[in-house]
Amino acid sequence: MSKERFDFIFPLGAGCSCSMMLREKGLQLASFPLDWVGTPDFGAAGDIRAKTDIVVGRFENWFRKENLVRSPVYDTPRHLSYLDRGTGLYFTHDVAAGSSLDADYPAAREKYARRIDRFLQLLSGARRVLAVWVNDPRIPGEVGEEDLRYCLDAFARAYPRAGFKIVAVNCVHGVKPSDMRVAIGEGYECYSFDYRAFTECSDDLVWEIRRDLFAPLLERFEVADYRTRAEKRANARREKARAMEKYRATSALDLWLTRLKFKVYRHLKRSLERKGVVVESCGAGTARG
């Protein structure tokens, strides 16, 4: 069966899992500004509308230092969380724990400038565009037809030469995947079901996303390879480095297991010899007469 092909596919949020799923399926080939940010204070409908407004506004007021305030509610062991009062977004991956905004802001600002430039160039040159939005299970509410029409109209006004489609996925607690609610209209698809995965983290029950449940929703799509030759070469080098690291880790594990087996064998051999059993190199044993 032929797949629906797009020039550009990008994540609208609401959290990190959307970008992670697109990458796993080969539908996102580069990093973009909305990959790891969210607006949980806005609710589901507010999040997708806010992200759309940011895109059509060409990221005006994005990540300005004077708008960033500490908000430790989303701190992690590795990073400090900051609320951007200009956009309502939470930035949770840009200031390292133990560091400061003053120290880490220049590099983060440069990173976002690079990603925004790439994003806007791809969006401006695309004729068929797919935006994917998957709600974070912790964000209340659902995205409905009115919200999707708002986003499609905003995209169409900002980029009249492109045809846009939105795939939105709501997390509705208690609705099994087999009972998924589906709404399909002109330019959008909306799926609603419960995709929470419960995992224990410290003393809290954390809601994660079961990304395996989304495979059928994304396998119908494909994207043109918009990477430059330099980006493809860089990606090939990264893949090779990851493969080598995996190989080294596997080799180290194999070596450790071999040494462990030898130690166990030597210990058993000595133990048997003390009992009068001769252990040959092949592993057979004969009793001394």
Region locations from a protein language model:
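Short, conserved loop/helix-junction motifs that constitute active-site signature segments
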Residues: 123-124, 155-162
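Surface-exposed cleft-lining segments at the edges of enzyme active sites
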Residues: 90-110, 133-143
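Extended, charge-rich low-complexity interaction segments
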Residues: 187-239
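Membrane-proximal basic amphipathic "stem/tether" segments
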Residues: 228-289
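Short beta-alpha junction loops
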Residues: 135-137, 164-176
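Short, charged beta->alpha transition segments
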Residues: 75-81, 111-123
